[in-house]
């Protein structure tokens, strides 16, 4: 188990740090007394704010050996804070692979003394992944009280899983307690066969002016039963408006379970006063295979 930090402070802010990872020899996946493999890369860890931090990753992260524990994880955390802002943090991954499930956070909630702590804001953060393969799950997550102008880009990315019961799904989720506005998820040349695929921009009070772009993408199901869940929603909220979903050449495997595919520019919660309006779907080449 390894933890790498570009910066850390337990009573204040940590800003403007860069962590460059270019391994000459990938991290080994091995049996050990813990019974699992878990490694973490932190741009910053602080209590009152993490801003303008960058993680750059090149070359393979792990050996090609497969580990099979539900606790396995490779965590890439651009910014983690108990309060304050988590803005302008960036993660770049190029020409790499991992046989551990990969979890990427530009900002994340923290559990302390059975209480959840969220950054006040997660704005103008960026994740860019190019030429990358995860042989387990791949998840990118942004969590804050407010989240705006965040961008997540995939280009030539694979999330390859088996049909085991440790499949936790592959997801991109931007989630805000209050508002999530002007965020973009742009996926190109991507494939995933995770049991649970979720690509969501969501907030409790308002999700507006968000955009999800899907180009040349395949979603499949590793299970022999051909059962899984796929959700693509650009604005999930009690007030979702002016969101856009653009689909160009999306291929779906056979999902045999009912109520398994949800694709929409906007969706509302079950509250009677929830509303959704001025949302747009552009679709070209959408088919089952």
Regions found by a protein language model. Give the residues of each.
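Surface-exposed loop/turn motifs in large extracellular/passenger domains
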Residues: 1-30, 36-260, 264-289
């Amino acid at each position: 188990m390894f933890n790498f930090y570009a910066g850390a402070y337990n009573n204040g802010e940590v800003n403007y740090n860069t962590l460059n990872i270019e391994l000459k020899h990938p991290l080994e996946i091995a049996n050990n007394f813990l019974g699992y493999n878990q490694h973490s890369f932190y741009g910053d860890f602080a209590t009152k704010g993490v801003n303008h931090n960058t993680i750059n990753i090149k070359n393979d992260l792990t050996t090609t050996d497969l580990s099979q524990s539900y606790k396995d994880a490779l965590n890439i955390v651009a910014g983690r804070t108990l309060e304050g802002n988590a803005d302008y943090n960036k993660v770049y991954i190029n020409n790499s692979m991992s046989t551990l499930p990969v979890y990427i956070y530009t900002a994340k909630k923290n559990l302390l003394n059975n209480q959840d702590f969220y950054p006040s804001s997660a704005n103008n953060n960026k994740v860019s992944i190019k030429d990358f393969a995860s042989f387990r799950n791949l998840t990118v997550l942004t969590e804050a009280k407010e989240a705006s102008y965040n961008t997540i880009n995939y280009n030539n990315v694979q999330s390859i899983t088996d049909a085991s019961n440790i499949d936790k799904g592959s997801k991109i989720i931007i989630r805000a307690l209050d508002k999530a506005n002007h965020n973009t998820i742009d996926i190109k040349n991507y494939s995933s066969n995770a049991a649970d695929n979720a690509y969501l921009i969501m907030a409790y009070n308002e999700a507006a002016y968000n955009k999800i772009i899907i180009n040349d993408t395949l979603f499949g199901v590793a299970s022999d039963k051909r059962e899984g869940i796929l959700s693509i929603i650009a604005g999930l909220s009690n007030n979702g408006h002016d969101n856009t979903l653009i689909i160009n050449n999306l291929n779906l495997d056979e999902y045999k379970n009912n109520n398994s595919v949800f694709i929409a520019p906007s969706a509302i919660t079950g509250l009677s006063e929830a509303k959704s309006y001025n949302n747009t779907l552009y679709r070209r080449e959408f088919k089952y295979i």
